């Protein structure tokens, strides 16, 4: 029973996420955080639904989640990690780059993305690097390194 209570404390609701990230509809791509170690790692959920605007044109006959939005969802989970670091200056951390991103399987409406990110480094209190992975049904669909920068 105690383990369950402690794990629930490490979860973040959509309302809490809205307090950490500046993203709003239609670009808020994290539904909830199911594991959170502030400043170290986070695991989040993104439920992919046919009602999302990108599926009107990507592709109407065979809807696929655009790879850039999978990467953006990983970046938002990385942003949750970075924004909870106590010693960093306050400000807007933005997505600054990607390395070695690979897409392995398509993501379609009805899928649930499980996004896992881990902080790799912080430099000069303004640049961060995160390792991100996205899974559907336990299968890796995307992985790579994401960089962040503090905007003055």
From Swiss-Prot:
GO terms for cellular component: cytoplasm; membrane. GO terms for molecular function: (3R)-hydroxyacyl-[acyl-carrier-protein] dehydratase activity. Pfam families: FabA (PF07977). Gene3D superfamilies: Hotdog Thioesterase. Its main location: cytoplasm. It is found in: Cytoplasm. InterPro entries: FabA_FabZ, FabZ, HotDog_dom_sf. GO terms for biological process: fatty acid biosynthetic process; lipid A biosynthetic process. Keywords: Cytoplasm, Lipid A biosynthesis, Lipid biosynthesis, Lipid metabolism, Lyase. Its EC number is 4.2.1.59. PANTHER family: 3-HYDROXYACYL-[ACYL-CARRIER-PROTEIN] DEHYDRATASE. Involved in unsaturated fatty acids biosynthesis. Catalyzes the dehydration of short chain beta-hydroxyacyl-ACPs and long chain saturated and unsaturated beta-hydroxyacyl-ACPs. Belongs to the thioester dehydratase family. FabZ subfamily. This is 3-hydroxyacyl-[acyl-carrier-protein] dehydratase FabZ. The gene is fabZ.
